[in-house]
């Protein structure tokens, strides 16, 4: 847990068998100024989190504006929610100006990646696979770019690739999408894209 810290490195840990989030960074809701910046979360193996006991959690959870914070090279899987919210990587309220790259997240009971709301995050070169409710979710459409999503691999099993209020203000480019059953891809609920 790194609440109001900066220049912290959380690396090379095996984190498992917890009822809530594996790594938490930041603790300011919304877009207010935060003491959290330039943190690095890397090379962690995070798994068996939640056990269907708690909700609103992630293998890696962030909160608030965090310029320079980097989440990379983490392996996150088997995240199990009680009622809602079991994600591999979860930038929650106001999480902004972060780089999320080269992570693998799979077998989550919600989507693998969820951004509640935030500004100008870069999400690239990740693999998100077999989320129970799809691959990627965002909660709020905002006037600014919420996140840039590029060069990622999304693997689904008859689930939507993206879920959210609508396409939102996202930049998506150069991603690879695949359904393990060879079915037509569900880009978003109620819409099919071949």
Regions found by a protein language model. Give the residues of each.
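Glycine- and acidic/polar-rich repeat regions and solenoidal domains
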Residues: 1-194
């Amino acid at each position: 847990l790194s609440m109001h810290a900066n220049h912290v490195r959380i690396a090379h840990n095996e984190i498992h068998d917890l009822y809530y989030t594996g790594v938490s960074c930041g603790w300011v809701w919304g877009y207010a100024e935060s003491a959290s910046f330039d943190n690095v979360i890397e090379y962690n193996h995070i798994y068996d989190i939640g056990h269907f006991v708690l909700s609103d959690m992630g293998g890696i959870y962030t909160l608030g504006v965090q310029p320079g914070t980097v989440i990379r090279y983490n392996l996150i899987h088997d995240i199990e929610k009680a009622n809602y919210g079991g994600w591999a990587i979860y930038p929650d309220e106001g999480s902004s100006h972060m780089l999320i790259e080269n992570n693998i997240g799979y077998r989550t009971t919600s989507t693998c990646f969820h951004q509640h709301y935030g500004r100008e995050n870069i999400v690239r070169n990740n693999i998100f696979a077999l989320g129970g409710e799809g691959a990627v979710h965002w909660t709020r459409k905002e006037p600014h770019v919420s996140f840039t999503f590029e060069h990622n691999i999304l693997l689904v099993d008859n689930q939507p690739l993206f879920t959210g209020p609508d396409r939102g203000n996202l930049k998506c480019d150069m991603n690879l999408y695949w359904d393990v059953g060879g079915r037509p891809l569900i880009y978003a609920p109620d819409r099919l894209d071949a």
